[in-house]
């Protein structure tokens, strides 16, 4: 069983090292993002099979809650991580498509959460903002602020 510990500021260098060696496919997977959100959703980490894994507890402090796993950063498979953690895991979140396909092939239920999907836009589409598709972005006004 691997040691799971709360994410702390002292973990910054090790997390950034893993993210540098294994660039994530999920845009929100940065140390800063994880650290900022650690109070609203308790985030833990563990090192397993030369990978780092982030675990979120959806419950309140003292409440058991559900443990939800992020995609491992490194070479470990999500299934081997679940076995190594030795805890009951309610699910995995924000996994790349190839991992989702692997989980489907293992007869696990996989659902797409479009509200948390990363989106890609063509540079020319954003530069021109042509058509109704970009109407809300066209009417956005940038207002400079002073500090």
State what each model feature region is.
Residues 1-27, 126-147:
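Short amphipathic alpha-helix that is part of the acyltransferase structural core
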Residues 2, 44, 66, 117-119:
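A broad, low-specificity signal marking well-ordered, structured residues that form hydrophobic/aromatic
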Residues 10, 41, 114-117:
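Sequence-level motif detector for i,i+2 pairs with an aromatic at +2
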Residues 14, 27, 31, 115-117:
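A general marker of short, structured functional hotspots
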Residues 17, 28-98:
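Conserved donor-binding loop and adjoining core beta-sheet/short helix segment
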Residues 18, 22, 35, 119-121:
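Sequence-level detector for tyrosine residue identity
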Residues 22-25, 33, 47, 64, ...:
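Generic alpha-helical propensity signal that fires on short helical segments
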Residues 71-147:
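Acyl-donor-binding surface of acyltransferase catalytic domains
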């Amino acid at each position: 069983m691997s040691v799971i510990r709360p994410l702390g500021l002292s973990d910054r260098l090790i997390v950034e090292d893993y993210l540098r060696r294994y660039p994530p496919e999920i845009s929100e997977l940065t140390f800063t993002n994880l650290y900022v959100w650690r109070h609203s959703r308790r985030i833990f980490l563990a090192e397993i099979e030369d990978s780092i894994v982030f675990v979120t507890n959806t419950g309140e402090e003292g409440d058991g809650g559900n443990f939800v796993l992020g995609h491992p950063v490194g070479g470990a498979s999500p299934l081997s991580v679940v076995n190594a953690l030795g805890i009951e895991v309610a699910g995995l979140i924000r996994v790349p498509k190839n991992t989702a396909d692997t989980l489907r092939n293992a007869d696990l239920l996989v659902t797409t959460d479009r509200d948390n999907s990363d989106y890609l836009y063509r540079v020319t589409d954003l530069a021109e903002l042509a058509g109704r598709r970009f109407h809300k972005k066209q009417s956005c006004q940038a207002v400079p602020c002073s500090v």
